Amino acid sequence: MSKRIAGPEIERLIQLLARVPGLGPRSARRAALHLIKKKEALLVPLGGAMQEAAEKVRICSCCGNVDTSDPCTICTDERRDPTTLIVVEDVSDLWALERAGTMNVRYHVLGGRLSPLDGIGPDDLNIKGLVERVSTGEIKEVILAVNATVEGQTTAHYITDQLSSFDVRVTRLAHGVPVGGELDYLDEGTLAAALRARTTL
């Protein structure tokens, strides 16, 4: 049995930090110590921000994004193209696409991807909400921005089937050579996808 080296409040802080993705027990201890050392500058404001987020952040009932308003800021932005919808697996994917800043459109967050091995089926994802949005007739193109994994591709095929009866163009992100990537370092699947998604110059 390991010895307790700190009070229960500090141990609880470490245990909770260790639950954050990307932080293991050791990283959580380091983060906790850093927060405690910078109590007034970091720990107190962080605690307040987390409390405020817990009280005010909600899931958008339209697209599944997280925001302090429902519908979210993206869904209510009239400058965005309402006829194009990008479908993503998770909010982090939505944020990544927004950082890229290449398209001023609306989104739909699935909340995961189909994975029969993990017991995740269509009813566990926000696919029904997507079909309802497309059924209004306002959306002309659905861009499937799912990950290039077996589960991601399975999800893309399922969604394509679900939307086949609607007058909507379904596309997906091209997969292939990343900017700055060298061919010698790419796997065969990535190279094959890049060749299939080649474009005319």
Swiss-Prot record:
<keyword id="KW-0479">Metal-binding</keyword>
<keyword id="KW-0233">DNA recombination</keyword>
<dbReference type="Pfam" id="PF02132">
    <property type="entry name" value="RecR_ZnF"/>
</dbReference>
<dbReference type="GO" id="GO:0006310">
    <property type="term" value="P:DNA recombination"/>
</dbReference>
<dbReference type="InterPro" id="IPR034137">
    <property type="entry name" value="TOPRIM_RecR"/>
</dbReference>
<dbReference type="Pfam" id="PF13662">
    <property type="entry name" value="Toprim_4"/>
</dbReference>
<keyword id="KW-0863">Zinc-finger</keyword>
<dbReference type="InterPro" id="IPR023627">
    <property type="entry name" value="Rcmb_RecR"/>
</dbReference>
<keyword id="KW-0862">Zinc</keyword>
<protein>
    <recommendedName>
        <fullName>Recombination protein RecR</fullName>
    </recommendedName>
</protein>
<dbReference type="InterPro" id="IPR006171">
    <property type="entry name" value="TOPRIM_dom"/>
</dbReference>
<dbReference type="InterPro" id="IPR015967">
    <property type="entry name" value="Rcmb_RecR_Znf"/>
</dbReference>
<feature type="domain" description="Toprim">
    <location>
        <begin position="83"/>
        <end position="178"/>
    </location>
</feature>
<dbReference type="GO" id="GO:0008270">
    <property type="term" value="F:zinc ion binding"/>
</dbReference>
<dbReference type="Pfam" id="PF21176">
    <property type="entry name" value="RecR_HhH"/>
</dbReference>
<comment type="similarity">
    <text>Belongs to the RecR family.</text>
</comment>
<dbReference type="GO" id="GO:0003677">
    <property type="term" value="F:DNA binding"/>
</dbReference>
<dbReference type="InterPro" id="IPR000093">
    <property type="entry name" value="DNA_Rcmb_RecR"/>
</dbReference>
<keyword id="KW-0227">DNA damage</keyword>
<keyword id="KW-0234">DNA repair</keyword>
<dbReference type="GO" id="GO:0006281">
    <property type="term" value="P:DNA repair"/>
</dbReference>
<comment type="function">
    <text>May play a role in DNA repair. It seems to be involved in an RecBC-independent recombinational process of DNA repair. It may act with RecF and RecO.</text>
</comment>
<feature type="zinc finger region" description="C4-type">
    <location>
        <begin position="60"/>
        <end position="75"/>
    </location>
</feature>
<dbReference type="Pfam" id="PF21175">
    <property type="entry name" value="RecR_C"/>
</dbReference>
